Amino acid sequence: MIFDKDDFKAYDADLWNAIAKEEERQQNNIELIASENVVSKAVMAAQGSILTNKYAEGYPGRRYYGGTDVVDVVETLAIERAKEIFGAKFANVQPHSGSQANCAAYMSLIEPGDTVMGMDLASGGHLTHGAPVSFSGQTYNFVSYSVDPKTELLDFDAILKQAQEVKPKLIVAGASAYSQIIDFSKFREIADAVGAKLMVDMAHIAGLVAAGLHPSPVPYAHITTTTTHKTLRGPRGGLILTNDEELAKKINSAIFPGIQGGPLEHVVAAKAVSFKEVLDPAFKEYAANVIKNSKAMADVFLQDPDFRIISGGTENHLFLVDVTKVVENGKVAQNLLDEVNITLNKNSIPYESLSPFKTSGIRIGAAAITARGFGEEESRKVAELIIKTLKNSENEAVLEEVRSAVKELTDAFPLYED
């Protein structure tokens, strides 16, 4: 390392101590936030490398600055690996985030004011799928589709009927809180039927898609976007895929010079490392274990009548639980669990009656605990600890028992081996 830990600590003790406290928190907490994961040391090394010094506006072979031969190699590695993972003809690895990837995708497919259909936030969609507080809802005329009120599943007949009525230029598929398999072929059929384009945001399930454990949207979507963290287990960032050469040109222009300047080549390098990890056969085993652990936790809640799992179960890395029979709301549940070192987030549920700041539900994800080595037995234990906490929220003796059990689990599965 150019700047080792001792030098860092001596130079900026305040910042060093803050980072050390966060490392301690991550080690001693059970992380269930579905959008978080644990990256490898190789990913962190790449992201902390000397590549952070280099400015490289443009794309490999077409840069505005000199001295880019090496970063061209780095970015090309990331591009080619992304294409191999997802079977796409074109990939842009420069987006700084999933939201910026989505912004560039919209710019490549539609014009401001065009009508777009996206999943309702309470049904499991994302802010960038048309929420009024997001650039997406402010720039385009978004009309939301929802899940069926009884099954809490996507109702493709209802979505088709709605599309025929509103005649969107674009349909957005994908979710941030939907626990079932999404049939992207049906979304493409609906888009074709009404003359719309299809964009898929697979940010949450990209790792499962990469492992062949969830149907891929790439053959069906005009543009597919994703983050590179979450189930993909890479650095925080975005990725855009397409099989259409003309759209690829528009995507590249939308990213640079459209909404970004120079790419973060140290982050691109970290993406390249994580993509190499995804191509390793061990990643498929990891992804399979994520789903097993998610199901194991969900099964514990399904056996308790005081809790309700949205849509009745899970087929991916996450699930939502209605907690209102046990505690006042999801925010209360989140705060109670924080006190026993279990981290998750409050989450709206379909046809939500409470505000987004309170919510009726919590969202539970298995990606991070699986990366630490938790198996189905440990996952069931985690679910039991959540239930125990929420049902004994004023019993300090019970809460202390939970803290001790959490400590046993986190000690048994360290965040990183020394």
Curated annotation (Swiss-Prot):
Pfam families: SHMT. Catalyzes the reversible interconversion of serine and glycine with tetrahydrofolate (THF) serving as the one-carbon carrier. This reaction serves as the major source of one-carbon groups required for the biosynthesis of purines, thymidylate, methionine, and other important biomolecules. Also exhibits THF-independent aldolase activity toward beta-hydroxyamino acids, producing glycine and aldehydes, via a retro-aldol mechanism. One of its GO terms (cellular component) is cytosol. Its cofactor is pyridoxal 5'-phosphate. It comes from the Bacteria. Its main location: cytoplasm. This is Serine hydroxymethyltransferase. Keywords: Amino-acid biosynthesis, Cytoplasm, One-carbon metabolism, Pyridoxal phosphate, Transferase. GO terms for biological process: glycine biosynthetic process from serine; tetrahydrofolate interconversion. It is found in: Cytoplasm. The record marks H229 as: Plays an important role in substrate specificity. Pathway: One-carbon metabolism; tetrahydrofolate interconversion; Amino-acid biosynthesis; glycine biosynthesis; glycine from L-serine: step 1/1. Homodimer. CDD domains: SHMT. It catalyses: (6R)-5,10-methylene-5,6,7,8-tetrahydrofolate + glycine + H2O = (6S)-5,6,7,8-tetrahydrofolate + L-serine. Belongs to the SHMT family. The modification N6-(pyridoxal phosphate)lysine is found at K230. GO terms for molecular function: glycine hydroxymethyltransferase activity; pyridoxal phosphate binding. NCBIfam families: PRK00011.1. The gene is glyA.
